[in-house]
Amino acid sequence: MTETTGVPAAAALSVRDLHKTYATGVQALKGVSLDVQPGDFYALLGPNGAGKSTLIGIVSSLVNKSAGSVEVFGVDIDEDRDGAMRLLGLVPQELNFNMFEKPRDILVNYAGFYGIPRAQALLRADEELQRAYLGDKADAMSRTLSGGMKRRLMIARAMMTRPRLLILDEPTAGVDIEIRRSMWKTLREINAAGTTIILTTHYLEEAENLCRNLAIIDRGVIVEQGPMRALLSKLDVEGFLLDIDGPLPASLPQIEGATLQAVDDNTLDV
């Protein structure tokens, strides 16, 4: 809707009172609510097991919710699942493409699943490979790409449908800082071109470098949310505790603007 109607435009993502309880009895989400505005770069920050991937799975219709509502640009995922899914692209944490295909073929074949004509798909594939800094790898075997290149290929594939909302689940997990920064560059360019981006991460540095708004989730509950700078200022004063799966490392990482202190073997004071 336009501003002249007096009605605000729909949020890129609107989540209301979202619950998820698995068959095992585990409550992964406990009444999560949040809004992501069009054009935003938004982070879901939290430790492993906090509920980030479950939330993304529900939004992407890969996981069934127990209760609550989800809308993508005003389209309810229960009322019009296909319509909502056409508006978003998903980059999962796992590499899930054929390593024996060429990058261009991976993108073109993916576009075909969405009914995009081959001639148009070929043009888009070249555009997305260039944007992902993979133009010179279009005809290489995907298995020969570096780890960072493979992850950028996943982003290029998701962008083939021209989604208005791009969701990335732990896109830089397990990669070194140089690969991480190369991916940040690609994501900034995509966001600058108008695509709303949501990423899950447990790296505070990543959220701080990329995102304008942030929600901190722990044990299925949003514990803080709001503008990045305001939350960082608040955390400078208040701090927060993160429960970590498994023992903390002997040497804690250094994060600019934050002090990390081990409370016990599984709890980190930030």
For the regions a language model picked out, list residue spans one by one:
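Conserved catalytic motifs of ABC-family nucleotide-binding domains
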Residues: 162
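Catalytic Walker B motif of ABC-type/P-loop ATPase nucleotide-binding domains
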Residues: 166-169
